[in-house]
């Protein structure tokens, strides 16, 4: 659904993003209590907004409102007649627009601080007591804007909370969206539900019915849809939703590129085709992919080769599909999620390319297809909930993500059948042990990498000189930041022993304890 379509069905809070690293969390927190929220850049012109929000939240940001090139909101938001909440930079923006001095504070406030609620009658602070909040600012408001009152303070922020209740404009200097603010979620609920009067109707049960009806209306009674599936949760949920909407008029294609997990193609065929009843074609193109990867060591080149080859294979197989009604395929299904949308529309704009994302965007232009993205408004946790409601198994719904380029970017250096086989078997053993230990659902993603270095070892009385496996496991809520998972040493010892003894060509196993940032989740 587009933002306009969603807002026509669900009450929506508009989050205007000034570039804070926490902006996406505002949207997540609101949805956690069933209020839909849409994030747009702070430069959004209200005249171009074709829907009316129930309220507006101004996010934090890394700028100073008094700087020459500082971003400022379209003042027309104050004419919408809806409640407004400014967070951190957002509070300073409200003060600045109201002709109040904002400048550099004598002391910075980064990290936890004690919030003192000074006006308990303020609806924003209903059921919010003196508590710990998360600060991240150096600038501060020097005077109280005309028509506003102080609602909260901290040791270093005399205007930690301000409000003009007649105009329903509120500002807070701290970040309620982060979990470090112990009562932040209550405050956001107060704003969205009690002040903005947004209905708490956003849930996956309602989404299913709404989205299926939208798909049927968009596709019509005759058109056919094609889409790629990988066996991952996103493509599987999107495919099942499409199957529920139009049945066999949806054609799923699974391409075996030779760098999938162990027995992946057979598993997908059984799970999606036989288990979920999805109209599925499985294509073995492993030789084609691996031949093109010969001699390639640069990770970006690997990604592009796999992406381009995928498009070629997909187009070729799509041409073989003959719709029962004799008409051409008109639509392409893509499992885009909301974090992808956020990355493209955030105030910072498209960030510097760290890695090329493997997707099927090139198919649209080449095949002249119309795009359907039924999951584009959803976060990962919402997709998982949706999957279970659609009858997809818990094991599949909670499966760890797997990159589009597959094991090709987990074999550092040249990708050969032999190297893929080593990495694949090590990964299988690692995941098997994680499942046996009951840790799989505690970990967001785990995998084994084959490093392009050799290490001396001893097996029996023989000297060995073989390769190194690096294990990686992370915990995260959104994959934008991540911490390494703290396995017990005994667990790592067991996994390392199995890999060295059961995987030919491996002499040493290491464990990656780098967080994101500075590292990315994948090694390539």
UniProtKB/Swiss-Prot annotation:
Indicate the segments forming the Glutamine amidotransferase type-1 domain, all copies: 12-201
**Which biological process terms from the Gene Ontology are attached to this UniProt entry?**
GMP biosynthetic process
Query: Cross-referenced PROSITE patterns, in alphabetical order?
Result: GATASE_TYPE_1, GMPS_ATP_PPASE
Biochemical pathway: Purine metabolism; GMP biosynthesis; GMP from XMP (L-Gln route): step 1/1
Q: Where on this chain does ATP bind?
A: 230-236
One Pfam family linked to the record: NAD_synthase
Q: What class of enzyme is it?
A: ligase
Its required cofactor(s), as named, are: Mg(2+)
Q: Give the molecular function GO annotations.
A: ATP binding; GMP synthase (glutamine-hydrolyzing) activity; GMP synthase activity
Q: What is its EC number?
A: 6.3.5.2
Location of this chain's protein in the cell: Cytoplasm, Cytosol
Catalyzed reactions: XMP + L-glutamine + ATP + H2O = GMP + L-glutamate + AMP + diphosphate + 2 H(+)
Give residue ranges for domain GMPS ATP-PPase. Answer: 202-399
Q: Catalytic site residues?
A: 88, 175, 177
The alphabetical list of record keywords is: ATP-binding, Cytoplasm, Glutamine amidotransferase, GMP biosynthesis, Ligase, Magnesium, Nucleotide-binding, Purine biosynthesis
GO cellular component terms, alphabetically, are: cytosol
Name the Gene3D superfamilies on file: 3.30.300.10, 3.40.50.880, HUPs (3.40.50.620)
Can you tell me which residues bind XMP?
303, 461, 516, 522
Described purpose of this protein according to its UniProt entry: Catalyzes the conversion of xanthine monophosphate (XMP) to GMP in the presence of glutamine and ATP through an adenyl-XMP intermediate.
NCBIfam families with a match to the protein in the record: guaA_Cterm, guaA_Nterm, PRK00074.1
Subunit text: Homodimer.
According to UniProt, the name of this protein is GMP synthase [glutamine-hydrolyzing]
Source organism (scientific name): Kluyveromyces lactis (strain ATCC 8585 / CBS 2359 / DSM 70799 / NBRC 1267 / NRRL Y-1140 / WM37) (Yeast)
- Please name the gene that encodes this protein: GUA1
